[in-house]
Amino acid sequence: MSMGSNFQESFQKALCSMEEGLNGLNSLVEKSVFPDDDEITSELTIPGPKRIFYVADAIRKGWSIEKIYSLTKIDYWFLDQIKELIDIEEKLYDSNIEELDKDYLQEIKEKGFSDSRIAEMIGVPEDELREHRKKRNVYPIYRRVDTCAAEFETSTCYMYSSYGGKCESNPTTKKKILVIGSGPNRIGQGIEFDYCCVHASLAMQEEGYESIMVNCNPETVSTDYDVSNRLYFEPITSEKILDIIDIENPEGVIIQFGGQTPLKLADVLSDKGVNILGTNVDAIDRSEDRERFQELVNKLNLKQPTNGTAKNQREALKKAEKIGFPIVVRPSYVLGGRAMQLVNNTKELEKYLNEAVEVSNSKPILLDSYLTDAIEVDVDVVSDGINIEIGGILQHIEQAGIPVSYTHLRAHETRGNLVCRLLLE
């Protein structure tokens, strides 16, 4: 969900919030290379998850609003709003950064264009565009959500960004901590991450800090009005987080409880001098980079399945052949089971590498020999580096590595003392 001062702003903020690699109303393909007419006609006629992007690409390709309406029956008002965004986009592609004066920047920011999207279209780094925008004195303002539909006067600390008008944020001078939420729920990043953020916020308040929550999911506990002292309902992007940090000036930012969504901002926040509380950026990278993590496991001489890391498709296929199928493939910089897959042969691995994941020097993948008939156990622990407290032991009822029906696997009983013994080893 997103909020803004107009449809175009809200629409583009919503697209940025989806965590689908979008920074606005992106094209489905590279600029000037569009789907063929038959594909567009089919996608416009039959509603689907990518329909709105086909609407935009049809406009980019020169289709009339009338033709698009006849296929989609989307109201003309919405189609005109989208066309206006495409018109601005075409103008931006022909612009350079010096042509973006204060009035022009203000206009396009009011229509929801993100710094990342603008920078992409004019061909400059996002950081350069951000600094240019600030030099032109174009900043977001924050409006408070009226939770009573104007029936009577109320003051909430529930805010969203916009451009133009009076800022209603009124930040305090109290000591404060900002907690970055988990954004949209999905496989591998579920509600448990949100609940961690909730407890982080409550703990900060108990310690005498003003807690600030940033999230964009209305279906979570973290966006309840009484969980934090101040709530910003915003996309979890570097632009939005840095803007909030600029106005609130927190003593520190917590990123480790929201899953992969805030963790991917670790480097940019650290580079900007933001004080990241808890697990440091290097430790986060060591646990998320499959190659670095593998080096640590080997150094500690821990037991593990036969495995290997790969930085390109050729290397992955070669190591898979050496390990032997079936194997479990995991990308770097993801949590939970997202983009993790069990592959049984070379053909399945090639499909996975081509369609499901990006493999590069900076994003190696891990290939593990799949353990058949294995029991999977989760152990939650807290340690100060010397002492270990076990918070809970959870045995999976499904086969390790892949969800299957309980009836396909006999019930097991794992004793807590066995787990403790293995931990001590």
Please tell me what each predicted stretch does.
Residues 105-130, 235-257, 359-376:
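Phosphate/diphosphate-binding loops
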Residues 407-414, 418:
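Conserved small/polar residues in nucleotide/adenosyl-binding loops
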Residues 305-341, 370-386:
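Rossmann-like NAD(P)H-binding beta-loop-alpha module
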Residues 131-137, 143-302, 311-318:
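ATP-binding N-terminal substructure of ATP-dependent carboxylate-amine bond-forming enzymes
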Residues 300-305, 322, 326-329, 342-372, ...:
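Conserved ATP-binding module of the ATP-grasp superfamily
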Residues 29-35, 267-270, 394-406:
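Flexible hinge/switch segments at interdomain interfaces of large molecular machines
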Residues 5, 9-50, 56-61, 67-152, ...:
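Terminal amphipathic helices with adjacent charged low-complexity linkers/tails
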Residues 10, 68, 118, 183, ...:
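Buried hydrophobic positions in well-ordered alpha/beta secondary-structure cores of metabolic enzymes
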